[in-house]
């Protein structure tokens, strides 16, 4: 059976990033969903400038379709075709790798033509046909641990990728269900998943979600993003995933748990300090 890579390199040239438990933290960041070309470029420009000033590797993320909205009326995004055009333009302009989530087998090949990292949503982390189709694109995979899975259960998830010929997999912690409308983050999961051999990413913003907690939409407690992110980075992770928006309270999705764009410099400075200590 193919071994997973403990050091995953993504992108090319000056924008290339490395995910490794032993190397400097890499950031995955961007708005929850792609709202427009103009909005994507605005957020990306701010993040690129910030990450350059900090010497921090950046993967830009955004979703073309929020397929698991709480309500049928929830806004879902601009769609696959338009989003791929925007992602291609973003890569040409800024040089960074990009990440987006996929929901069906049919989307894998189309998205992989442009996107560097295919993300498997937590709710779909056991869907074998989707995982195999994603693996066969050859792109790096970021698979979110299902809220219903133990960290050691990710061994079987990881094997679906490696046995399909893809060793470039990131395992992402995003909280575990704890009763109704509540998630908790068990920091033990980070070293447990790292012991499986793949780099581990901590999703600091979805971990503070309150699923369905607002009745027709998901709630969240963004005031705890920094607390959990600092804890995870202190334990030791290859990357941290943070959704951000210039006006989270008026964002079309996941506003309650997104970090205001203006607060990102302070957050990242603190996380890099913790990362330096954890990996000293």
From Swiss-Prot:
GO terms for cellular component: cytoplasm. SUPFAM superfamilies: Aldolase (SSF51569). One of its GO terms (molecular function) is 3-deoxy-8-phosphooctulonate synthase activity. Gene3D superfamilies: Aldolase class I (3.20.20.70). Its EC number is 2.5.1.55. Keywords: Cytoplasm, Lipopolysaccharide biosynthesis, Transferase. GO terms for biological process: keto-3-deoxy-D-manno-octulosonic acid biosynthetic process. Pathway: Carbohydrate biosynthesis; 3-deoxy-D-manno-octulosonate biosynthesis; 3-deoxy-D-manno-octulosonate from D-ribulose 5-phosphate: step 2/3; Bacterial outer membrane biogenesis; lipopolysaccharide biosynthesis. It is found in: Cytoplasm. It catalyses: D-arabinose 5-phosphate + phosphoenolpyruvate + H2O = 3-deoxy-alpha-D-manno-2-octulosonate-8-phosphate + phosphate. Pfam families: DAHP_synth_1. Belongs to the KdsA family. PANTHER family: PHOSPHO-2-DEHYDRO-3-DEOXYHEPTONATE ALDOLASE. This is 2-dehydro-3-deoxyphosphooctonate aldolase. It comes from Rhizobium meliloti (strain 1021) (Ensifer meliloti). The lineage of its organism: Bacteria, Pseudomonadati, Pseudomonadota, Alphaproteobacteria, Hyphomicrobiales.
């Amino acid at each position: 059976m193919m071994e997973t890579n403990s050091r995953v390199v993504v992108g090319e040239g000056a924008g290339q990033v490395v995910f490794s438990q032993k190397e400097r933290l890499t950031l995955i960041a961007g708005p929850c969903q792609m709202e427009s070309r103009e909005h994507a470029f605005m957020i990306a420009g701010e993040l690129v400038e910030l990450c350059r000033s900090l010497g921090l590797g950046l993967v830009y993320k955004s979703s073309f379709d929020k397929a698991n909205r709480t309500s049928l009326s929830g806004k879902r995004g601009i769609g696959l075709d338009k989003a791929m055009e925007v992602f291609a333009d973003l890569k040409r302009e800024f040089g960074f790798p990009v990440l987006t989530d996929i929901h069906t087998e049919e989307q894998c090949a189309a998205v992989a033509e442009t996107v560097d990292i295919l993300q498997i949503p937590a709710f779909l982390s056991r869907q074998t046909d989707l995982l195999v189709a994603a693996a066969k694109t050859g792109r790096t995979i970021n698979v979110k641990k299902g809220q219903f899975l133990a960290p050691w259960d990710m061994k079987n998830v990881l094997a679906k990728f490696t046995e399909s010929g893809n060793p470039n997999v990131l395992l992402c912690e995003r909280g575990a269900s704890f009763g109704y409308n509540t998630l908790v983050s068990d920091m033990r999961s980070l070293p447990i998943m790292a012991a499986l051999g793949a780099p581990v990413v901590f999703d600091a913003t979805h971990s503070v979600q309150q699923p369905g907690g607002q009745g027709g939409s998901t709630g969240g407690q963004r005031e705890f993003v920094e607390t959990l992110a600092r804890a995870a980075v202190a334990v030791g992770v290859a990357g941290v995933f943070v959704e951000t928006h210039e006006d989270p309270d008026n964002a079309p999705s996941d506003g309650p748990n997104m970090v205001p764009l203006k607060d990102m410099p302070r957050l990242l400075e603190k996380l890099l300090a913790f990362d330096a200590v954890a990996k000293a």
